[in-house]
């Protein structure tokens, strides 16, 4: 690409372009030329590939053809959406000078920078999903992490203590754009993430960060926000705020505070747990058959986004949870009345962000007005609900009668998309605007009268008066009658079958009308900007109202789900444990064609670990996951799928369920499994809920069994976590005999000949066998293979009764039951030097060893 080194060799326009491009070398520059945004050189080549648009050439500059690509200005949002979805950023350069008065190229400047993490335009955002900008910082003491949702003003920071916690935060927040320092050491942690942006070190300086944040919030210090003693988080937040100011180039009044997210305030879930529980994304990367897909019937986009935040960050404060439960219970009788009204509120949260950024469009203000119009009915319906939390929400919603009246007077019922299209401000709002419009709108009547008058005066029946954008107003006469045109008609344009003329009176009226249209549009833009000035002083109360409406939507939704899906209200206990009566998996029960088999669960200080055995496909994984999901739902304040639930304190949820090769990192299935297991053993506490499924299956039988046994021992004896431990190693069913707090349960099945029926019912005690061959037959494995497998199984059982499936009192004899002491015969052989023996001594040793066996 050409550079600014040889500017003089270029045309004036290209000189202007290259200077602007030099200020934004790493992102695409949309350069406004008339009705198009043009891209040149490397930008044009990239855009043609990313957007599938034509790559052409524009003349020559500096003696070389200029690669060029362009998009129409009226379709720019569609193209921006495509680029943002691919992680690209775009600088928008507009004409700010007047072409009529400019000498040389029209003055242009970059008015905004669109990046994946800072978009607020409705067309570029997914309405039911948060769009976050994030920054990450690392030093010797740990990590700093900050996130900002510019479409709501929600600003958060945290200080993850280790790599695993940081990875979990990245997965939970899933930022659209991630800023990192140029010397960031842990690139493996963020490689492959979308929207990575390398930033200079000075942007992360702590003093600069404090100064930036205090300036934004209008404060002298950050003590009031509770973040003063979070230096690593502040470093990340400072860089993030600097980046937003650089890209938005406007004030950010909706970003009014910053909140510290502390680990002790919420239930911690690592990346593997979030993935395995399929909270908002299934294992295939989609959204079907997830917890959110069942639970999210919210009627506003902002409510949907809040519900997903709750699901990914369950709270541990029981006061908050009980308040939510009480609100859900109080709202159950009015959900059918509230939801249709709430639906009309729309996405007030994001409309307010665009208002703050002064990018709100006429239809945004119309939607805001429509939201205000719903408030009286919502407040009236909630007035009858006798619940303190509900009344608190009702108060926070506010009324905004004056703002509603203002928008009803100012904006027409169905405004156009853009202010520049005109016709946004309602008649009667401004007297001067009405006068200019009357003058412009009166043109049609005047032209009709002029046409009738001139036809009568000239006697020319083909005469008509018209207008086009190029030549303005004209009088048209057919070619056949054009020789009869009066002498005061001045020819303006010749067509194939007609001539067009102008007369002084029409020219004078044209100037007057065009002036009135221009003045009306200019005044309309001014009045529209003044509306922002009238609305923005109320921004804080409006944001509080939007948050209350979103929370109401979530709670009404949870009330409806509880009633529709037959959920019950869980109770919280100070004592450790989980007691569930007839628990169900919230997702599986919705996709099954037959009734779901509900099952109990009892974990307590005296029964902290359940060893779960049973056939493949018997329901072990479903049983384990449903326990975690019931706990998760309880800790967002929701009702749960069970007959009754009592649940004690939980600080973390871990899952070690299933695995696949991590080819990108060069890790095998077994390595992935062991890494996740190590994380659990290092971080679980006695208040953690741990799900362990098939530990050790990725290696040899003896290695796997040894690891599974040791892990179970560690969890039961040392950590004492609440653990569900599913296994096919039946030797582990001996654990309850060897240590306290461990019990056996199994998933039932019935076998008849070559067929098997899964009962999906949890029973006390260990399973008698795993039914592996029956499941293989069910899967369609050829009969001759199944027959051969049965023969081989009988051989193995006869050769190695201790290691095979020999049934002893409902369990199996343990591979680990062999005494650890070495036998005397083995010890004697180890100490024997066969090379030093005579034939007679060797014979004596044979008899001696025989006697030791």
UniProtKB/Swiss-Prot annotation:
Domain of life: Bacteria
Coiled coil: none
Claim: Zinc is one of the keywords in the record: no
Disulfide pairings: none
Gene Ontology terms, MF aspect: ATP binding; ATP-dependent DNA damage sensor activity; damaged DNA binding; mismatched DNA binding
Keyword field: ATP-binding, DNA damage, DNA repair, DNA-binding, Nucleotide-binding
A single Gene Ontology CC term: cytosol
Binding site residues for ATP: 614-621
GO BP: mismatch repair
Entry-linked Pfam families: MutS_I, MutS_II, MutS_III, MutS_IV, MutS_V
Keyword Transport: no
Family: Belongs to the DNA mismatch repair MutS family.
PANTHER family listed in its UniProt record: DNA MISMATCH REPAIR PROTEIN MSH1, MITOCHONDRIAL, DNA MISMATCH REPAIR PROTEIN MUTS FAMILY MEMBER
UniProt protein name: DNA mismatch repair protein MutS
Originating gene: mutS
């Amino acid at each position: 690409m050409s550079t600014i080194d040889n500017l003089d060799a270029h045309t004036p326009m290209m000189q202007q372009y290259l200077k602007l491009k030099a200020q934004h070398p790493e992102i695409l520059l949309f350069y406004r030329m008339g009705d198009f945004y043009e891209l040149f050189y490397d930008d044009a080549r990239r855009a043609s590939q990313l957007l599938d648009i034509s790559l052409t050439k524009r003349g020559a500059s500096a003696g070389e053809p200029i690669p060029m690509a362009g998009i129409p200005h009226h379709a720019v949002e569609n193209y921006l959406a495509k680029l943002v979805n691919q992680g690209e950023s775009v600088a928008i350069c507009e004409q700010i000078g007047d072409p009529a008065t400019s000498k040389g190229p029209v003055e242009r400047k970059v008015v905004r920078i669109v990046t994946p993490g800072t978009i607020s335009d409705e067309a570029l955002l997914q309405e039911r999903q948060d769009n976050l900008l994030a920054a990450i910082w690392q030093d010797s003491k740990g990590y700093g992490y900050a996130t900002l949702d510019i479409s709501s003003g929600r600003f958060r920071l945290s200080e993850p203590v280790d790599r695993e916690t940081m990875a979990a935060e990245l997965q939970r927040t899933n930022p659209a754009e991630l800023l990192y320092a140029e010397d960031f050491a842990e690139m493996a942690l963020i490689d492959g993430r979308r929207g990575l942006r390398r930033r200079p070190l000075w942007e992360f300086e702590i003093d600069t960060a404090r100064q930036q944040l205090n300036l934004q919030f209008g404060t002298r210090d950050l003590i009031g926000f509770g973040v003063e003693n979070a230096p690593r988080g502040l470093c990340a937040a400072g860089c993030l705020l600097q980046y937003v100011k650089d890209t938005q180039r406007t004030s950010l009044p909706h970003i009014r505070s910053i909140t510290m997210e502390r680990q002790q305030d919420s239930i911690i879930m690592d990346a593997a747990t979030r993935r395995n529980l399929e909270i908002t994304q299934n294992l295939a990367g989609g959204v079907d058959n997830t917890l959110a897909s069942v639970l999210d019937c919210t009627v506003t986009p902002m409510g949907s986004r809040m519900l997903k935040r709750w699901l990914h960050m369950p709270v541990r404060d029981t006061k908050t949870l009980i308040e939510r439960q009480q609100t859900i219970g109080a709202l159950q009788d009015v959900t059918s009345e509230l939801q249709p009204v709430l639906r009309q509120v729309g996405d007030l949260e994001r409309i307010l962000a665009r208002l703050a950024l002064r990018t709100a469009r006429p239809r945004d203000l119309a939607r805001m007005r429509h939201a205000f119009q719903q408030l009286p009915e919502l407040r009236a319906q909630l007035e009858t609900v006798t619940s303190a939390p509900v009344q608190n929400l009702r108060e926070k919603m506010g009324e905004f009668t004056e703002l509603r009246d203002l928008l009803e007077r100012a904006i027409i019922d169905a405004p156009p998309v853009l202010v520049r299209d005109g016709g946004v401000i309602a008649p009667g709002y401004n007297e001067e605007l009405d006068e200019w419009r009357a003058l412009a709108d009166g043109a049609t009547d005047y032209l009709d009268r002029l046409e009738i008058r001139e036809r009568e005066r000239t006697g020319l029946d083909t005469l008509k008066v018209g207008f086009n954008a190029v030549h303005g107003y004209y009088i048209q006469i057919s070619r056949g009658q054009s020789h009869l045109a009066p002498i005061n008609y001045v020819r303006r344009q010749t067509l194939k079958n007609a001539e067009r003329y102008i007369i002084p009176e029409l020219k004078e009226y044209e100037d007057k009308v065009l002036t009135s249209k221009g003045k009306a549009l200019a005044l309309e833009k001014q009045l529209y900007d003044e509306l922002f000035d009238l609305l923005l002083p109320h921004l804080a109360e409006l944001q509080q109202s939007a948050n209350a409406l979103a929370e109401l939507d979530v709670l009404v939704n949870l009330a409806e789900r509880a009633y529709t899906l037959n959920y019950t209200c869980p109770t919280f206990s100070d004592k450790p444990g989980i007691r569930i009566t007839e628990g169900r998996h919230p997702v599986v029960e919705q996709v099954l064609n037959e009734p779901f088999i509900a099952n109990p669960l009892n974990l307590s200080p005296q029964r902290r670990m359940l060893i779960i055995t049973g056939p493949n496909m018997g329901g072990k994984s479903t049983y384990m996951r449903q326990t975690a999901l019931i706990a998760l739902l309880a800790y967002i304040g929701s009702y749960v799928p069970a007959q009754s639930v009592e649940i004690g304190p939980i600080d973390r949820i871990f899952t070690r369920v299933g695995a696949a090769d991590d080819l990108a990192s060069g890790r095998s299935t077994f390595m992935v499994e062991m890494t996740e297991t190590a994380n659990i053993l290092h971080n679980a506490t006695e208040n953690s809920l741990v799900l362990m499924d098939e530990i050790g299956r990725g290696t040899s039988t003896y290695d796997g069994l040894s690891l599974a046994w040791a892990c179970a021992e560690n969890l039961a004896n040392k950590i004492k976590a609440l653990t569900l431990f599913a296994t096919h190693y039946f030797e582990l069913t001996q654990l309850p005999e060897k240590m306290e707090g461990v019990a056996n349960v199994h998933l039932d099945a019935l076998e008849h000949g070559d067929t098997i029926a899964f009962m999906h019912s949890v029973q006390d005690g260990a399973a008698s066998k795993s039914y592996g061959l029956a499941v293989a037959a069910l899967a369609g494995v050829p009969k001759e293979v199944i027959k051969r497998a049965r023969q081989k199984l009988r051989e193995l059982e006869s050769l190695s009764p201790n290691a095979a499936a020999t049934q002893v009192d409902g369990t199996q004899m343990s591979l680990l039951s062999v005494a650890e002491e070495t036998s005397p015969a083995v010890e004697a052989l180890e100490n024997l030097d066969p090379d030093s023996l005579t034939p007679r001594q060797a014979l004596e040793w044979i008899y001696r060893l025989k006697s030791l066996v």
